[in-house]
Amino acid sequence: MPKRADIKKILVIGSGPIIIGQAAEFDYSGTQASLSLREEGYSVVLVNSNPATIMTDTEIADQVYIEPLTLPFIKRILRKERPDALLATIGGQTALNLAKELAEDGILEELKIELLGTKLKAIEAAEDREKFKQLMEALKEPVPESRIARTLEQAVHFADQIGYPIIVRPAYTLGGTGGEIVENSEQLTEVAKNGLELSPVTQVLIEKSIAGYKEIEFEVMRDGNDNALIVASMENFDPVGIHTVDSIVVSPVQTLSDREYQMLRDAALKIIRALKIEGGVNIQLALDPDSLRYYIIEVNPRVSRSSALASKATGYPIAKMAAKIAIGLTLDEIVNPVTGTTKAEFEPALDYVAVKIPRWPFDKFAEADRELGTQMKATGEVMAIGRNFETALMKAIRSLEIGTFALDDLTYSDLSNQDLLNRLMPATDERLFMVADLLRRGITIGQIHEKSQIDEFFLDKILHLIEIEKELKMHVLDFKILKIAKENGFPDVTIARYWQLEEKELRHLRKKEDLFPVYKMVDTVAGEFSSKTPYYYSTYELENESLKEKRPSVLVVGSGPIRIGQGVEFDYATVHCVKAIQKAGYKAIVINSNPETVSTDFSVSDKLYFEPLTLEDVLNVIDLEKPIGVVVQFGGQTAINLAGRLENNGVKLLGTSLKDINRSEDREDFNQVIKKLDLSQPFGKTATTVTQALSVAEEVGYPLLIRPSYVLGGRAMEIVTNRQDLSDYMKRAVKVSLKHPVLIDSYLTGREAEIDLLSDGQTIIVPGIMEHIERAGVHSGDSMSVYPSQYLDQNVQEQMLDAAFKLAKELHTIGLMNVQFVIHEQQAYVIEVNPRASRTLPFISKATDLPLAQLATRVMLGEKLADLGFKSGLMAPKKLVYVKALVFSFNKLPKVDSSLGPEMKSTGEVMGVDRNLAKALYKAFVAAGFKVHEHGNVLFTIADRDKKEALALAKRFDELGYVLWATAGTSSFLHENHLPVRQLGKISEDQLNPVTAMRQGKLQIVINRLKTDEPLESDGRAIRAAAIENGVPLFTSLDTVAAFLQVLESRSFNVSAINKGDKS
């Protein structure tokens, strides 16, 4: 079937900011799909609100809009661009919901815009719980007994009929948002009410729980000719009851008999054909481990995180194929880009095992509920490939970057056998390590299976790893055991620990015994056909399929899994680095472990190694490829932390030298740099013991900003105001030592600003100065930013530029550097320098239209900025205003406090662009999910220290016509200052209080400033939690409130009586 000739222009909707449930996989799929459509000759218009993506680069689509993903803005773009068709299946749940809204609005029909790929009817049949159930019943495909509830009363009634336990599943939500397994009616009341509020169609499914069944997934493709195939089969290590994104997942399936596999495969193919989906779909099924009974759990009629995993696990580019199917091509017409010879209709065949392990944010949020269930909590994931399950699992464990290299890196000696068994259910993020520890103690596979419902096949594989552990400890320096361990994924660092050697010594021993990994190709055809993919994984076998070319190469170290503090912006930088290396004539090699990202698309680089980002795994690739240099500037703290050990092993690092990286990262060395350059810096010292920290604090003076050295995303950073707080922090948050001192700084209040600069050692260019909206004390990664600067005076800007230039020269910067300042009493103080690409790089690159990562790479490869037409200095600002706003995922982590401070908490970002600040702010707030009401009720609950500042803001709300509500202390203060205010009671009281007011929909905005000594169980914390739970815009920084007021004021008209006041 030839591709469609009746359409010329296609609008592609992206997925917006990174949140828990919707991460970098949609940048990968959106980029793939857009390029695929352009490859076929179509004009592509792309809209997304997230600047930290490759898909919003101007070369990805013919027209790129960075605008809020809301109905009004999409409609404006549709009217302006007049596309012939709309593709909404590669932008996650956000794009699907928008497609539904656009169709219901009538604009698609009005402008004669066709929905490509999966039609609205199919989307509704898969997403609407009632229609899905009806379709499954018509197909005679079993679904768990369930009822649709549209009210709380219906939910309770249906649950009583079905019987507990039940699963509550809200319709049209993302990542299982609002979903939960419920044991009783009291729990149901809370969960169902929340689910109905979260569902855009006010609908929840009350479903009989089948927790404990095996969870199986199929990624399925279908074209317009009804050709369909299974791209990948995936099995969850964890049984039904844990969201698949929070499960360890294995591909291909491991424990099914041929009969079971064919039965489920047939069901999946029957469903995609019945839905008439054209493109890709993810189908989740539950199989009774003791019979052939199975149930259909759900169908995702779009590209998903599982699709990205399946694409990387098999090499089959699902989003690319889905885009081609959407414009009319059929699977038997599309060439498989992996082989270059076979067609896309052939099902991939795997001669290896891929394992995915989720990356959770619990290292950042100690107070978070670690229990795993039907609502996802992972921010990202890693994938590893091996010849067997054991190898892939061990490689995935060390890819997580949580300090674990093997199964014995987390043990539970403080727990008895029974206590540890009991901890298996409900499951937490540590269950895998708990299982290993139980097996180590001699607890049987049967006992663990009975408690956890994890299949005995997987438990037996873990036991095999425990047995190898024991053998290694018993047979020190035994080469035979070493070989077995390496064939099963054990890293050098773990074996060296067992044998009481340094890692370097074990590496030398391996080399002496000629024990090296070889690299096998991921080819989709299990070696049956020749393949041209440059996509490899390591294994300890004989034949190496990755052959070194004569052309000189450069290795780029990726950034690993998405987590808070290190997001998709670093993958953006990695991809741009690769492009520049290729343009310079070198072979670009990428090593990374993240299946969601564009950098791990095999078509991006000349060679891709899907490997953990550890010293051993990176050195193994370097030994084979012998690159002319290695780039660590774009992989965030992950790559920077490898720099020293790589150089110590004789690796040449491109860009800023290791010595100068360390001078910027090590506090004492950096203090000497600041002193030498005569720059201003908050007074501070380091401490290596608790006693020393208390002594330093007295010298520096409270309040203090405390943080460990060498951290990412402000982890374990805190503002303390007294000796007791400091003592508690030192005991709770950090492991202080001579090697890892704690930094203790005077906390200066003031506006923050930052600079990203580019230097070749001679010419230094500054694209722009970014000014933060929130003052010092809120982590820079959580602070809204504005470019160009709006409020910094010329003198302050010159101070910043002078300091940045001096630092770049003194640190011999080759490439990128990020410098952060606090402006205190018109003096610019240097607070931090990052000798690498920072998380602001995509934002400033998009705002200035300057490919900074590519330019930095060219500089690292020896080019001079002067030869490229640049002169030292600050570049002329753009005429538009650009605002970066942050997005948080507190609704997925209900026990995490939503107040902002020096510890980073955001998961993603959006950008607002317009001709003036107020309009750009409006777009940024809307894109970040804030509801902008022209009037309503605003709650003030303010700590004493902030009341005076809050008063001015309250007056502005009053002028706009907002009704002021407040808690007792704040209410008295506002009343004393002659403002009308309604007082609310304490949460413990029966009268109307902030929490019940929010639940009743009576509050449109909540402004909460916490006290410095606020206890965990406080009204303030409960108010913040209720705002998140009820979707009420919450502000914990008065600076953000002022910016929001600027938006409200710009959108309202002033009304005043002409006879008001004295005119004389």
Curated annotation (Swiss-Prot):
Mg(2+) 3 binds at residues 820, 832. Its EC number is 6.3.4.16, 6.3.5.5. The keyword Oxidoreductase does not apply. Mg(2+) 4 binds at residues 832, 834. SUPFAM superfamilies: Carbamoyl phosphate synthetase, large subunit connection domain (SSF48108), Glutathione synthetase ATP-binding domain-like (SSF56059), Methylglyoxal synthase-like (SSF52335), PreATP-grasp domain (SSF52440). Mn(2+) 2 binds at residues 298, 300. Residues 1-401 are annotated as: Carboxyphosphate synthetic domain. Mn(2+) 3 binds at residues 820, 832. Residues 930-1064 form the MGS-like domain. ATP 1 binds at residues 129, 169, 175-176, 208, 210, 215, 241-243, 284, 298. Mg(2+) 1 binds at residues 284, 298. One of its GO terms (molecular function) is metal ion binding. Residues 547-929 are annotated as: Carbamoyl phosphate synthetic domain. It catalyses: hydrogencarbonate + L-glutamine + 2 ATP + H2O = carbamoyl phosphate + L-glutamate + 2 ADP + phosphate + 2 H(+). InterPro entries: ATP-grasp (IPR011761), CarbamoylP_synth_lsu (IPR006275), CarbamoylP_synth_lsu_oligo (IPR005480), CarbamoylP_synth_lsu_oligo_sf (IPR036897), CbamoylP_synth_lsu-like_ATP-bd (IPR005479), CbamoylP_synth_lsu_CPSase_dom (IPR005483), MGS-like_dom (IPR011607), MGS-like_dom_sf (IPR036914). Residues 930-1064 are annotated as: Allosteric domain. Mn(2+) 4 binds at residues 832, 834. Residues 402-546 are annotated as: Oligomerization domain. Binds 4 Mg(2+) or Mn(2+) ions per subunit. It comes from the Bacteria. Belongs to the CarB family. NCBIfam families: CPSaseII_lrg, PRK05294.1, PRK12815.1. Large subunit of the glutamine-dependent carbamoyl phosphate synthetase (CPSase). CPSase catalyzes the formation of carbamoyl phosphate from the ammonia moiety of glutamine, carbonate, and phosphate donated by ATP, constituting the first step of 2 biosynthetic pathways, one leading to arginine and/or urea and the other to pyrimidine nucleotides. This is Carbamoyl phosphate synthase large chain. It comes from Oenococcus oeni (strain ATCC BAA-331 / PSU-1). The gene is carB.
